Amino acid sequence: MEILRIEPTPSPNTMKVVLSYTREDKLSNTYKKVEETQPRFINQLLSIDGITSIFHVMNFLAVDKAPKADWEVILPDIKAAFSDANKVLESVNEPQIDNHFGEIKAELLTFKGIPYQIKLTSADQELREQLPQTYVDHMTQAQTAHDNIVFMRKWLDLGNRYGNIQEVMDGVLEEVLTTYPESQLPVLVKHALEENHATNNYHFYRHVSLDEYHATDNWKTRLRMLNHFPKPTFEDIPLLDLALSDEKVPVRRQAIVLLGMIESKEILPYLYKGLRDKSPVVRRTAGDCISDLGYPEALPEMVLLLDDPQKIVRWRAAMFIFDEGNAEQLPALKAHINDNAFEVKLQIEMAISRIENGDEALGSVWKQMANRTI
């Protein structure tokens, strides 16, 4: 059994080790401590200083490390463990990229359009928080005797966030309470009881003018306007451009999200403003939007992000260059080859290799890892 390759994952504390051997039992196991009944190579890996657990399924391992441990120290020990156990030369080659490094997915559970729970999901952690009791009470008021609650409830995608998961939860909670103020709950209940919610597709959209937005002094009202904004058009750019200068990060972030929905190269200068925002959350969100659009014209701006102080932003830049870059970006990539964040350094190395070899970009599927049972 050899190591075929080592891949980064969305979690900075987890690496995927792809093996030449595929389990025939189609089972999965999580190992946290050395035990005699376990495979020898698993125990050897668990004996490595810094490794906290190993998830084994199909043909790969998900190896977790302690937050303060260093992958650059651990990975050679992992390779050596396989070499010692199998007496074969491992072939570690071309790690593959994943699109979601550092992301925390935010979702809102609703029933007939009434929110009552938030869920955050990262690569290796899930956090839930119920909204204040009044939201649950109003959700209950919207139920009828014939409602199938399990079928009719719906998770709304609130987009991706970045940072400490508890701090993200605090911020998302504030945004949700702003978007759905308590004063609006009776209206939502009335609508829920009057309308047919068999498909549960209700969402309140309202277009606002630049003058109306500009006249609003309360940032929470401005955020609520943007959160209820329909898909924008070119005519909405002045309003969204104004929102990019808002003092509140959630407002600026939502403006970037809306701008990214205008699928045109003409929107790039406004997304570039997001790349230069003082908040790393806004910068990363702008980088994500640019990556989704996939315009190579953005390469010069994304190259500048290789000097960003936040690794989640630098990683996005390296990822974009991996996908869209060419020989013109090689000098910049090589100048940053010694990035102090291992995950960023790995993406830069992969971008250099892809460009020099002319290979196509590859993605990774993490469904099994996301659904693993610890």
Curated annotation (Swiss-Prot):
Pfam families in alphabetical order: HEAT_2, Nfu_N, Virulence_fact
SUPFAM superfamilies xref list: ARM repeat (SSF48371), Hypothetical protein SAV1430 (SSF110836)
Endoplasmic reticulum listed as a keyword: no
Superkingdom to which the source organism belongs: Bacteria
UniProt GO molecular function: oxidoreductase activity
UniProtKB keywords: Virulence
Known function: Required for hemolysin production.
Family designation: Belongs to the CvfC family.
Protein name, UniProt field: Conserved virulence factor C
Lineage of the organism: Bacteria, Bacillati, Bacillota, Bacilli, Bacillales
